[in-house]
A protein has these predicted regions:
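DEDD superfamily 3′-5′ metal-dependent exonuclease/proofreading module
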Residues: 1, 10-16, 38-200
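Short, flexible loop/turn motifs enriched in small residues
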Residues: 1-3, 26-27
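Conserved hydrophobic/aromatic positions in well-ordered beta-strands
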Residues: 6-8
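Short, surface-exposed acidic-centric catalytic microdomains
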Residues: 15-36, 40
Length: 200
C-alpha cells in the first residue's frame, strides 16, 4: 500500500514537485512510521483516498512518458511492481533510469550499503530530509544526473532502447549471481527474480 506519492518533474530546468499523502486503509507499522514520520492517525486524518492517489500517480507517470521524459526511480523493480500489483494493469511504456541498478552494475564490488543516503554521499549529492518522499525523489534524480554526467558518461551515448536493454541485462546478470550465491549457501532463492524494470 502507498502512504506518500512524490513525483518531481524536471523538464528543461523547470522543476515541479507534487507530493500526496494517502490513507492506505491499513495500520502503518510503528517501525515504518519512525522512518518516514507518518503515523496511522495522520494518514487517516489527512490522507486522500488510496486508490485515487495511486491512479493519479500512474496517470502522471504516463503523462511524463508521453511528453518524452524519463522516469527516474531508485530500485525500480520494487516501486513499479507495487504499482502493477495495486492497479492490476500498470505497464512500462516509456524509458526508466534506475540509479541503484546503475551503481550496482558499474561499481559491482564496492563494499558498504547502497541505500539512497549512502549513494548520495558516494556521488556527492546533498540529501535534505531523508525518507521524506519529495526529498528522496529529488535526490534520486540528482544521483542519476551525477552518474550520467560525471561518472559514467558512456551512458549518455546510449539511445533509449539501448539504455533500457543495458539495465535489463545487467539486472538479470546481477540477480543470477545473487541466486547462485544463495543456493551455494543453502538458502532459498525462489524470491530472487530477474525481471526489470518490473519483477516477474
Amino acid at each position: 500500500r502507498v502512504v506518500t506519492s512524490a513525483l518531481v518533474r524536471i523538464d528543461d530546468g523547470a522543476v515541479d514537485a507534487d507530493e500526496t499523502l494517502a490513507d492506505p486503509g491499513v495500520e502503518i507499522p510503528e517501525a515504518a512510521a519512525k522512518v518516514h514520520g507518518i503515523t496511522t492517525e495522520k494518514a487517516r486524518a489527512e490522507g486522500r483516498d488510496h486508490d485515487e492517489v495511486v491512479r493519479e500517480t500512474v496517470e502522471a507517470i504516463k503523462k511524463g512518458w508521453e511528453d518524452g521524459l524519463t522516469l527516474v526511480v531508485f530500485n525500480a523493480p520494487y516501486d513499479l511492481t507495487v504499482l502493477r500489483q495495486l492497479t492490476g494493469d500498470f505497464t512500462v511504456t516509456g524509458p526508466v533510469f534506475d540509479p541503484l541498478l546503475i551503481d550496482r552494475a558499474k561499481d559491482r564490488y564496492r563494499k558498504g550499503p547502497r541505500n539512497l543516503t549512502s549513494m548520495c554521499q558516494h556521488y556527492g549529492v546533498r540529501l535534505d530530509n531523508a525518507h521524506e518522499a519529495t526529498a528522496d525523489a529529488f535526490a534520486a534524480a540528482r544521483v542519476a544526473w551525477m552518474q550520467v554526467r560525471k561518472h559514467y558518461p558512456e551512458l549518455a551515448q546510449m539511445d533509449t532502447g539501448e539504455l533500457m536493454e543495458y539495465q535489463a541485462v545487467e539486472y538479470f546478470t546481477l540477480q543470477e549471481d545473487r541466486k547462485k550465491y544463495f543456493e551455494s549457501q543453502g538458502r532459498d532463492a525462489s524470491n530472487v527474480l530477474p525481471g526489470w524494470p518490473m519483477l516477474g
